[in-house]
Design a protein with these regions (language model features):
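Hydrophobic beta-strand positions that form the internal "hydrophobic ladder"
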Residues: 135, 180, 229-233, 273-277, ...
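Multi-bladed beta-propeller domains
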Residues: 152-167, 196-221, 247-263, 291-309, ...
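Amphipathic beta-strand/beta-sheet edge segments enriched in Tyr/Trp
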Residues: 64-119
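Residue-level detector of Asp-centered blade-edge/turn motifs that repeat once per structural unit
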Residues: 129-131, 175-176, 227-228, 271-272, ...
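C-terminal/domain-edge helix-coil "capping" segments
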Residues: 2-20, 96-160
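A flexible loop/linker signature enriched in serine peptidases of the S9 family
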Residues: 128, 139-147, 165, 183-192, ...
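Short beta-strand->alpha-helix linker/helix-N-cap micro-motif
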Residues: 5-75
C-alpha cells in the first residue's frame, strides 16, 4: 500500500485489506477532563471495530500496533467549548481536518461517534464505514419458532423483522438494503417472502401440491439477489429434483439455471452478476461449484476430504468465504476462485460456519457453537479479532447471518 502525506492532503492507493496505523494523542484539555479515560476507550473500540484502523496502545490485541510499525496518521484528542474534537493530523502532528462531537452532561452519543468514524473511513478509502450497520439472522427462541431478527454491529438495537406465525429462515438483504428476503416454513409448505420493513410483505413464490400441476414446485427457498434488485436466484424443487432458478420479481417468471440430477442449493452471485457459486452433491457429498452465467460453463471449486457449503462472494468479487467440514468439525475457509489459493480462518474443537461479508469486505460474521449453543461472532478477514456480536441469553440460538449497509 503506497501512502504519502503532506499538511494539505492524504494520498492513498492499493488499500486491499490493510488497515491504517493511527496514534491517538490526547491534548492537555482532553487529559484534564474527568471522563477522558472512558472516552478514549470508546474511541479506541470504535476505531478498532470499524475494521479500518490499527491503534497504538489499543486495548484490543487484534487492533494494537506492534513494534516499530510505521504510522499513517495521528488523531489529536481535544475538548473545547462542550465539544470533543478529533483532529486528523499527519505523522508530524500537523492538523489536516477536525471532526467535532457535541458533549452534553459529560457525555456524547456513541452513535454520533460511529457516524463520524464512518465518514472518516469514507474520506480515506472511498468506501462507507460499517459501524452501526445491520446484521439480520435467524433467532431460535426457547420453545418457540424461529424468527428473523436484526442487530447492529455493536450488538445493540435487537429487534424482530419477521412477524408471522411460521418458521422464518435464510435472511438475505436486497442490494439497496430497503427490503429483505427470507423463507417461511408452515404446514401449508414453504414460501419466499420479500419484507419491505414497513409492515408490508409480499409472497414471491409458494410451494404447492405436486399433483396439482406439473409446473408447481413442492419446495422453494430463498437465495441471492441480482445487483439491480429485480431478479433473484432461488432454490426450487420439482418432483425429485432440486435445482437453481433465476426468478424475475416483477413478472414472477423463473428460468432454470442448473439441470443436474443432484441436489443444488445455496446460490451466491458475484457482484457483477456474471459468476455463480453454489452447493451440489454431485460427487456424493456437498461441494462448491462455479457457474459462469454467460456461457453456462460450470465446474467444481472445492476439494478435500470433507464436505463444503455456505459459499459467499466478497463485495469486490475476488474471494469466496465458505464452510468446510473435516474431522467432524466445521470451519470457515477463504478461497480465491481464480488462483485456487485457500486459507483457513477458524480453528477449534467446535463448529464455525455460515459466513457472511461486511459491506466493505473487511470483516466476516458467522455462527459458532464454541459455547455449546450457536451464537454470532465477527472477525476480520485475516481471521483475527474474533468477538461475540450479541448479548442474547444462552438458550437462544443464532444462525444464518446476513450483513447490510443499512444503519440501525
Amino acid at each position: 500500500m503506497a501512502q504519502t502525506y503532506s499538511s494539505e492532503e492524504i494520498i492513498i492507493s492499493g488499500l486491499g485489506f490493510t488497515r491504517f496505523a493511527v496514534a491517538l494523542e490526547p491534548q492537555p484539555a482532553f487529559e484534564d477532563h474527568p471522563e477522558s479515560p472512558r472516552w478514549k476507550r470508546i474511541i479506541d473500540r470504535n476505531l478498532c471495530w470499524s475494521g479500518s484502523f490499527k491503534i497504538t496502545k489499543s486495548r484490543y490485541a487484534s487492533c494494537r500496533l506492534k513494534g516499530e510499525n510505521r504510522l499513517d496518521m495521528k488523531i489529536l484528542l481535544d475538548v473545547q467549548e462542550q465539544q470533543l474534537i478529533m483532529t486528523v493530523a499527519d505523522t508530524e502532528g500537523v492538523p489536516l481536518f477536525p471532526l467535532k462531537l457535541k458533549i452534553r452532561r459529560n457525555n456524547f452519543r456513541e452513535s454520533k461517534l460511529m457516524e463520524m468514524i464512518n465518514n472518516l473511513t469514507k474520506e480515506l478509502t472511498g468506501i462507507p464505514g460499517i459501524l452501526g450497520s445491520t446484521i439480520a439472522f435467524t433467532l431460535k427462541q426457547p420453545a418457540r419458532r424461529k424468527i428473523i431478527a436484526r442487530v447492529n454491529t455493536h450488538g445493540n438495537k435487537l429487534g424482530a423483522i419477521s412477524r408471522n406465525p411460521s418458521i422464518s429462515l435464510l435472511p438475505r438483504w436486497s442490494p439497496d438494503s430497503r427490503s429483505i428476503l427470507y423463507t417461511i416454513l408452515s404446514r401449508q409448505g414453504t414460501a419466499i417472502i420479500q419484507d419491505k420493513l414497513k409492515g408490508k410483505t409480499v409472497t414471491l413464490l409458494r410451494s404447492e401440491n405436486e399433483v396439482s400441476s406439473n409446473r408447481n414446485f413442492v419446495n422453494v427457498s430463498g437465495g441471492t439477489w441480482f445487483s439491480d434488485g429485480r431478479k433473484l436466484i432461488v432454490t426450487l424443487s420439482r418432483g425429485n429434483n432440486t435445482d437453481l432458478y433465476e426468478f424475475d420479481i416483477r413478472s414472477r417468471r423463473e428460468k432454470r439455471l442448473t439441470k443436474h440430477p443432484a441436489i443444488e442449493t445455496s446460490p451466491s452471485l458475484s457482484p457483477d452478476n456474471q459468476h455463480l457459486v453454489f452447493v451440489s452433491d454431485r460427487t456424493g457429498q456437498e461441494q462448491i461449484y462455479y457457474k459462469q452465467l454467460g456461457t453456462g460453463v460450470d465446474f467444481r471449486l472445492s476439494y478435500g476430504a470433507g464436505s463444503s457449503s455456505d459459499p459467499a462472494w466478497s463485495p469486490d468479487g475476488t474471494l469466496i468465504a465458505f464452510t468446510r467440514v473435516e474431522r467432524g468439525h466445521a470451519q470457515i475457509h477463504m478461497l480465491d476462485p481464480f488462483s485456487g489459493e485457500e486459507t483457513v480462518l477458524t480453528r477449534g474443537r467446535y463448529n464455525s460456519e455460515q459466513p457472511a461479508w461486511s459491506p466493505d469486505g473487511k470483516q466476516v460474521v458467522f455462527a459458532s457453537n464454541s459455547t455449546g449453543v450457536y451464537k454470532l461472532y465477527l472477525m476480520f478477514v485475516d481471521g483475527t479479532g474474533r468477538r461475540r456480536l450479541t448479548r442474547i441469553p444462552r438458550d437462544f440460538e443464532e444462525s444464518a447471518p446476513n450483513w447490510s449497509s443499512r444503519k440501525l
